[in-house]
Amino acid sequence: MGFWMAMLLMLLLCLWVSCGIASVSYDHKAIIVNGQRKILISGSIHYPRSTPEMWPDLIQKAKEGGVDVIQTYVFWNGHEPEEGKYYFEERYDLVKFIKVVQEAGLYVHLRIGPYACAEWNFGGFPVWLKYVPGISFRTNNEPFKAAMQKFTTKIVDMMKAEKLYETQGGPIILSQIENEYGPMEWELGEPGKVYSEWAAKMAVDLGTGVPWIMCKQDDVPDPIINTCNGFYCDYFTPNKANKPKMWTEAWTAWFTEFGGPVPYRPAEDMAFAVARFIQTGGSFINYYMYHGGTNFGRTSGGPFIATSYDYDAPLDEFGSLRQPKWGHLKDLHRAIKLCEPALVSVDPTVTSLGNYQEARVFKSESGACAAFLANYNQHSFAKVAFGNMHYNLPPWSISILPDCKNTVYNTARVGAQSAQMKMTPVSRGFSWESFNEDAASHEDDTFTVVGLLEQINITRDVSDYLWYMTDIEIDPTEGFLNSGNWPWLTVFSAGHALHVFVNGQLAGTVYGSLENPKLTFSNGINLRAGVNKISLLSIAVGLPNVGPHFETWNAGVLGPVSLNGLNEGTRDLTWQKWFYKVGLKGEALSLHSLSGSPSVEWVEGSLVAQKQPLSWYKTTFNAPDGNEPLALDMNTMGKGQVWINGQSLGRHWPAYKSSGSCSVCNYTGWFDEKKCLTNCGEGSQRWYHVPRSWLYPTGNLLVVFEEWGGDPYGITLVKREIGSVCADIYEWQPQLLNWQRLVSGKFDRPLRPKAHLKCAPGQKISSIKFASFGTPEGVCGNFQQGSCHAPRSYDAFKKNCVGKESCSVQVTPENFGGDPCRNVLKKLSVEAICS
């Protein structure tokens, strides 16, 4: 009897756990999961921007970094490339991705949208949607709403069928409908508001059992939670008092565009922004991005968004830790979680500590107390009095006190190591074969129309390329044939790039930019008496991903097209007979694939084309040993696309040099996307990620299509590895270890901080490049001695670190031969070479 009673009680307990407790709700303090308010740290990882083989490692590293939730968009055009034909495999296996997150013990925030933006091609919309009769995007339009509801319902039903919502025992605790709709609604007016209310009701009626959010939109209807996106969101307040303060996109930097420099965001400012949000009552923060990844294939939007979507995220494009950002934020998350009991219990009280300083204190009835001491001054340290103690606050920083007494973390004091990454060649170059693609002609698979057609309407985005071809008849009596003053061809295009061929010869190239994709070709061209063939190769570089009325956007040669300098004056070519051909011959033959590559006759050796436009190159190589991330150095090439074993690494365009000013960037002060830049005057993207899972042990096919003309012999396969590691630690820097000792009762006096150095597995510290205890200056990779320097700064590191994978050295004067300058705030800067 006792056995069966125990079994019955166990069954009832299981039912209670699965049915009674599994719930997600919210109040004004936080998201409530299974009855418990939670401070949630989230990170964006977009499943198609990495490979399934990378997912477990990325998610594990996010978890180790203190992340509780993985956030992702759902990419409609990846899942329904043709109307009614769905795809959920390989990089688009959404269910598998969510289950990998679940296996790691993390939650999921599923941003169904289905508009994504995300610098993704066409904002995530499938191009076929543009051609649904009567459609108008993201407004009170029946054809659009019907398509949106159908896809959203399909995704929700898939999640339910796999039991992936938290209320079913799964990891999904939040969903999002629409995306950043506030600016759109403001522009559209009443139709936008009606659509927004419809979208909210449609989503709630799907019955997911978890809350829905709408981001960057102040007037979302109940019960939807409105949330904030931006570089800072401490100012944000939800539109109802019963909703939690949530930050769905804390931008870790910004995207890279072809022709632009590479943005980055200092770890200190990122931590400051997050701490500032938490101290003002925020309880959910998502890093956009935590791992940015790669825009493989033709998935980048913009137009002109680069193939790399690195975003200066805590995990870099290749999946490696970006230090110190990953480590500094990990320490921040640990400090915040120590404060969680107080943070979720009460609203803060605010006390001024000076003109630019304040304290925000969370003190619960149960006795939990946490304090955030902030110094908003961008230029000066502050010494503040709080709770009968004094605290030193660096400029533009926040100190976190989980017991309202002891500082465990300051946003401007980085305890994590920095790492300098390097790209090491793993091959001496490749043995190439080439195939030259001629300018298209009327004899090719073409169709004819009088006048100029919009590009995407013709290509339906199956290719970046559309040929516009026409004939120009030149009378033998034309004056320019004798004078040598060539006639002037002018072509107006909606974008994004254009190659002009005259009688099969390249006459010029023009291209736009993200800010101004439209372009004009205007140049003299060499014509002969008789019939001349004009071939315009119009190129799309990703479809726009943001803005109103997607159905109206266009690309390609829309005209006018004219020829000046003839006896007749100007000849309008716009309404001539034009021949059209979608794509390239090499695309039609699938030259990039293992099966299609043998379909043409390639040349090799001295006959390989170099610096020739419209050239295809191929080679084979064996996979290198090891497990370091791999990339192709494409710096000697112009523009085109790259494939490995038939899989596209993305568009390459290293010849588009970046503009902008890359001046020294300080972490203090307001950050925006133009503040901190690198790569000025260089190619926007040199390195192109090669996923190891795409490689065979031997015989890998590498194919490059080059539009402009480059030198393929400069292409090299490289591995990405740590070149050196650094520590930059102040004396008496706050550290969590002292707090842990205090809580354990083993605290007698605070311990000095330590410099921790760690190379990658398989590497060892081979030498110490720099070490100085005193007042060193500079940053990792470029340290210099200051006016104060302990002469034995190197000794402890040579003794304790050289020959080891990792080491720790306490930052205390005794380790460096004594105090080199008393009554001066000192720090230790060290750089160790990994090999």
Curated annotation (Swiss-Prot):
SUPFAM superfamilies referenced in this protein's UniProt entry, alphabetically: (Trans)glycosidases, Galactose-binding domain-like
PROSITE patterns the UniProt entry points to: GLYCOSYL_HYDROL_F35, SUEL_LECTIN
Enzyme active site: E180 (proton donor), E249 (nucleophile)
Reaction it catalyzes: Hydrolysis of terminal non-reducing beta-D-galactose residues in beta-D-galactosides
EC annotation from Swiss-Prot or TrEMBL: 3.2.1.23
A molecular function (GO) term: beta-galactosidase activity
Stored Pfam families: BetaGal_gal-bd (PF21467), GHD (PF17834), Glyco_hydro_35 (PF01301), SUEL_Lectin (PF02140)
Keywords, ordered alphabetically: Glycosidase, Hydrolase, Signal
Signal in keyword set: yes
Keyword flag Magnesium: no
SUEL-type lectin domain mapped to chain residues: 749-835
Recorded effect of pH on activity: Optimum pH is 4.5.
Residues of the signal peptide: 1-22
Example GO BP: plant-type cell wall modification
Cellular compartments per GO CC: plant-type cell wall; vacuole
Record's function text: Involved in cell wall degradation. Degrades polysaccharides containing beta-(1-->4)-linked galactans, acting as an exo-(1-->4)-beta-D-galactanase.
PANTHER family: BETA-GALACTOSIDASE RELATED (PTHR23421)
Family per record: Belongs to the glycosyl hydrolase 35 family.
Protein name per the record: Beta-galactosidase
Species assigned in the record: Solanum lycopersicum
